[in-house]
Amino acid sequence: MSKQPVALIILDGFALRDETYGNAVAQANKPNFDRYWNEYPHTMLKACGEAVGLPEGQMGNSEVGHLNIGAGRIVYQSLTRVNIAIREGEFDRNETFLAAMNHVKQHGTSLHLFGLLSDGGVHSHIHHLYALLRLAAKEGVKRVYIHGFLDGRDVGPQTAPQYIKELQEKIKEYGVGEIATLSGRYYSMDRDKRWDRVEKAYRAMVYGEGPTYRDPLECIEDSYKHGIYDEFVLPSVIVREDGRPVATIQDNDAIIFYNFRPDRAIQISNTFTNEDFREFDRGPKHPKHLFFVCLTHFSETVKGYVAFKPTNLDNTLGEVLSQHGLRQLRIAETEKYPHVTFFMSGGREEKFPGEDRILINSPKVPTYDLKPEMSAYEVTDALLKEIEADKYDAIILNYANPDMVGHSGKLEPTIKAVEAVDECLGKVVDAILAKGGIAIITADHGNADEVLTPDGKPQTAHTTNPVPVIVTKKGIKLRDGGILGDLAPTMLDLLGLPQPKEMTGKSLIVK
């Protein structure tokens, strides 16, 4: 019998705003999206701030978006959890932090703090670094070194100097800490197994290898002179007057990695924590007996201590589909595969019974503006075969392009990215409709809707604009004022399945 699948199609980084300047979503020629928008019930959803468990006004992101979508409720994000812990004094009593600090005091060794040096709030927040510096001062830790990963992606591309100056003020204020290395996140936070990048960051931190500077700001100035901005700054070493590195990571040191988002923290963490690491030769000085702390749970593969342990999410969308004996497919290209699997399942790595996954490799290019279509056509071809084969009751699909190309801050490639996705969307939705199925077309957060600032500069960060939702079923009405946490209840509603009590979101379909 022909399956009539209900598909949740996530156009990553695709939000709506009226102003067309710098707006790749508005400027793109997207006949399929426009046709569905005009023909079927539609509304807009909030995908940022408190609607997704973030601080008010904080832009959403893919991890947060998929967690909320899959959970069918507002999920309190790590950023909010840590902020509350700082505010209520719980941060200073955190046993894992205190154990790391005691470890270096007992061994007479150094504490290293590393993470993304910005207030972007997507992977980290600089205030969490300040809280760690304050705690180190309070606990009497003398040797504290900071390895700053420069952002330029979740914040403006040339904002590193302001964060470094602010950090230097805090170091002065607390009387503890020195900047030891700086590295663009392109190197230190790779997630695509481009180990040559990670190796450069590792060797700067452990061997003191790389360009050397007396002053962190001089490092940034020098990079800017060569047209290399924050995200891409080569791993660089800050040295003392005699040319020796301020600090390298050595045996018995402690590391606190203050990023809270796992995906871009895993590879560099594995480099330090895994005994059977084989991705590159770590050399004779690879530090032993490190006390390695992850701010949150990064992955089963990372052998470190976790300061803020995960909160379990029960009865996520995938689990409910599985409990009712439905077959489900998760499909995406590499860049968003963890999002439609791990994050969509509430932080669970394993598949549910009846769940299949298809991973299509993302193209190997330095930056995706060079190939705006990415692997969208390959994802589409793979999915069309599965729809034709009548195997699945539910499909969860992500198109990465509007987000990944939007991060370039380049308008033309981002328009091309949106257009490629629209072409693919048309094929997929029409195939689903031909089977008598239903598509829910939506997004997880904004990005491609604002790739230029009003004065024409690249805008590489996400946005706080609302995201669309279209349900390709005639004769229903969708309510306004919804959130991402309402999508799973809507999908269950369309499948005729009961909503579990843990899902506090509400179906968007007006009864």
Curated annotation (Swiss-Prot):
Cofactor(s), names only, from the UniProt record: Mn(2+)
Superkingdom: Bacteria
> Which InterPro entries does the annotation name?
Alkaline_phosphatase_core_sf, BPG-indep_PGM_N, Metalloenzyme, PGAM_B_sf, Pgm_bpd_ind
GO biological process terms, alphabetically, are: glucose catabolic process; glycolytic process
- What EC number(s) has UniProt assigned to this enzyme? 5.4.2.12
Which residues are recorded as binding Mn(2+) 1?
403, 407, 462
Describe its function.
Answer: Catalyzes the interconversion of 2-phosphoglycerate and 3-phosphoglycerate.
Q: Which reaction does it catalyse?
A: (2R)-2-phosphoglycerate = (2R)-3-phosphoglycerate
Q: Which keywords does this chain's UniProt record carry?
A: Glycolysis, Isomerase, Manganese, Metal-binding, Phosphoprotein
One GO CC term, this protein: cytosol
Q: Per UniProt, where does substrate bind?
A: 123, 153-154, 185, 191, 261-264, 336
MF (Gene Ontology): manganese ion binding; phosphoglycerate mutase activity
Task: Report the family membership.
Answer: Belongs to the BPG-independent phosphoglycerate mutase family.
Q: What is this protein called?
A: 2,3-bisphosphoglycerate-independent phosphoglycerate mutase
Task: Indicate the residues that form the catalytic site.
Answer: 62 (phosphoserine intermediate)
Q: Where is the PTM Phosphotyrosine found along the chain?
A: 36
Q: What is the enzyme's main class?
A: isomerase
Q: Where does Mn(2+) 2 bind?
A: 12, 62, 444-445
